[in-house]
Amino acid sequence: MIAIRGPRGVGRTSFLLEFAKEFFDPQLHQALYISANNFYFQGRGLQELVHEFVDRGGQVLIIDQAFKLPNWKDQLVEIYHAYPYLRVVFSTTSVHGEGANANHELDRITRSYVLHGFSFREYINQQTGLELGTYTLPQILEGHETILKAILPKVRPQEHFQDYLHHGYYPFCWL
């Protein structure tokens, strides 16, 4: 089981959709993307849907906004034990799965990845198509003039800064 965590607007949904599109052929019906924020799940659990999906040959279940399901942690653990060959990828916010509401069984069977917002450098790369590299603090302190001479002919960072402050940290929530 894989958890994709991150705050609202960081791009969890975009990531899951891109993952499904890139790795699974829709004609083969091997993967199913569902949004738990759907009226279908009001008063219903995942079990019936998962059972039918697996019976039809489904192999990968992608659940967006899993935290919207009632008792979502318990449901995911049940699915894990009932369908050991089913791969499950789900998204949740950073705060879910922590504190008093933690499900230690889910934590044990899940590998979590956190999506972070973009750095200013990443935002410029995404906006311009450039591949500006990273620098360590000592590199910046010792060679800032050389670094500027390499960057400024390619891009004018100040032209992107206000947009970055407005929507650059979470660039995918504006798509």
Describe the function of each predicted region.
Residues 4:
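Hydrophobic anchor at the beta1->P-loop junction of P-loop NTPases
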Residues 12-13:
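Conserved lysine of the Walker
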Residues 25-38:
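Conserved catalytic segments around the Walker B and adjacent sensor/switch elements
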Residues 42-89:
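Conserved nucleotide-sensing/catalytic segment adjacent to the nucleotide-binding pocket
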Residues 81-103:
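Sensor-1/coupling segment of RecA-like P-loop NTPase cores
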